[in-house]
Amino acid sequence: VGKRIQLTTVEDLYQFLTYDDNRYPLVSLHRGGPTSGYPENALETFAYNAGLQPVIVECDVRLSKDSALVLMHDNTLNRTTTGRGSVSERTLAELKKLRLVDNNKKITPYKIPTLDEALAWGKGKVIFTLDIKNDVPYESVINVIRQQRAESSVVIITYSAGQAGKVHNLAGDLMISASVKNLDDLARLNEKDIPDNKLLAFVGTREADPQLTKVLHDHGIMCILGTQGNLDKQAAKKGFQLYASFIERGADILSTDQPKEAGRALNFYIKKRGITSKFVQ
């Protein structure tokens, strides 16, 4: 049975996601970890994966026609649902009539979840990283987080220091994932006065320069490596222990499309080193 990430306060979240030598390496489910019978951005898919191991759930937030926040990666319904056309041209009631489709094009019984539903389900189980699509106002996402009192289980994904600064000004207690490809990126974040303990660094889809990793770790900032795509393919070819090597070389969180395989490698790494966390049980 998978262990849960049990966080009660936003301070627990800062503590759990601050780098130290004993940090607990984690798998992040890219788009929620779709697999056969389990579509992307579906609560049932999150639950399936969370039953196997402690997970971060990366998911995508869009607006319906009537301004409901729903989980959907594409701006159209065609690829992942039984519907057609734009997400933003359908009301929530219309979206709820559709079924989600898995990556093999199989229709599942599952429905498009709202952000509310996801946060209500995930509290005390998982950490969400929310990829907020471009026309969605940060304010509306923050309102839902506040209503659900889900501050302890959410990280907001940003793609520039400007976006990170905006989120921090709107909600100074929320954790932020920011793109950090070099030391200049880190300097720009520091200029926005975002404290290190409220940051995760997305270092990109190739391993970060060791010097950058060291500086981030010295700041207590954990590094997310995007293995989705190229590095996942390498691991499938060379053997899944490659995932543990990424961790050994300074990644802390792996955003992957192979959560089972990455999770097995990380579990082995964790056991071998006797890593524990009071927040994972």
Pin down the residues of each PLM region.
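Phosphate-group recognition and catalysis centered on beta-loop-alpha active-site segments
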Residues: 1-281
